[in-house]
Amino acid sequence: MKTSGVFLLLSLALFCFFSGVFGQGAQVDCAEFKDPKVYCTRESNPHCGSDGQTYGNKCAFCKAVMKSGGKINLKHRGKC
């Protein structure tokens, strides 16, 4: 019983770790920036795009995603 409990906890810990690492860069919800009238602030919260470009914040990243027709994805948060 102890062995199966340890195995279960280890499996859960590994799942949480890997889902956080690989899920971080998977998707960004850009719905709030779809309106072309929305202007981006100069807030610094870097996003690294799959194109190797560092975008200043989520808004700037989302505008680039829309301009590219969805070809750019989030590689990770932070500078490239």
Swiss-Prot record:
Leader sequence segment: 1-23
Record's protein name: Serine protease inhibitor Kazal-type 6
Alphabetical list of InterPro entries matching this protein: Kazal-type_SerProtInhib (IPR050159), Kazal_dom (IPR002350), Kazal_dom_sf (IPR036058)
Modified residues annotated as Pyrrolidone carboxylic acid in this record: Q24
Residues annotated as domain Kazal-like: 24-80
Site residues (Reactive bond), renumbered to this chain: R42, E43
Tissue specificity of this protein: Seminal plasma.
Disulfide cross-links: C30-C62, C40-C59, C48-C80
Compartments reported by the entry: Secreted
PROSITE patterns for this protein: KAZAL_1, KAZAL_2
Additional observations: The sequence of BUSI-IIA is shown.
GO-annotated molecular function: serine-type endopeptidase inhibitor activity
GO CC entries: extracellular region
Function of the protein: Serine protease inhibitor selective for kallikreins. Efficiently inhibits KLK4, KLK5, KLK6, KLK7, KLK12, KLK13 and KLK14. Doesn't inhibit KLK8. Inhibits acrosin, trypsin, and chymotrypsin.
Top-level division of the source organism's lineage: Eukaryota
Organism field: Bos taurus
Keyword tags: Disulfide bond, Protease inhibitor, Pyrrolidone carboxylic acid, Secreted, Serine protease inhibitor, Signal
Entry-linked CDD domains: KAZAL_FS
Chief location category: secreted
TM region positions: none
